Amino acid sequence: MRIEIFSDVICPWCFIGKRRFETAISRLQARGIDIQVDYSFKPFQLDPTASSSETTYAKDAYAKKFGGEQRAAEILQHVTNVAAQDNIEFNMDVALRANTFTAHRLLAFALINHGSATQILLKERLMRAYFTDGQNIADTAVLVSCAVETGIDETVARQFLESDELVTEVQYEIAQATEYGVTAVPTFIINGQWSVPGAQDVEMFERILERMHANS
């Protein structure tokens, strides 16, 4: 089963959806179901106008988008509580607004050169850098550090990030989301045909995956 997940590093529901999706796979395998899921991440930018060089707090961007600090605080507290139920720590008071295009380039590089397992690890690490550690994921040093933690050579990662390699390819993949009808993330594209939008609960992911496995 092949699944492509359109997702953004700064999307809280993408982190939650990733965790629930992976939990569903683990549960199915624990039940003795021989399900093999080849999944990887595709780029989507929720905030393409964010600066790549200047940092502001993400909570300020939420306040501007949702009509004030109080409403933003309510939204961020809600998603923090939901994340905690899936054993994810959000520290939204320190999260920094950042342009994610370069992070998406690095994720594409990881997939092409190191495979989906490394890309999945890198995706997790980048999201933790943003949501938990309050790091600027548009910063080259942060991106290199995350890459190294997932087994990518430091010099190779830095040279890649300082180049324009995969810029055109990632731009194309972002545009490809429109072709699939993706308007929000996360969106899970199964075998290039079926679309599952949103951070479904674990039980729903289990049912979907089990049904697809039975029909394969």
Predicted segments, located by residue:
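Structural alpha/beta surface segment adjacent to cysteine/selenocysteine redox centers
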Residues: R19-Y130
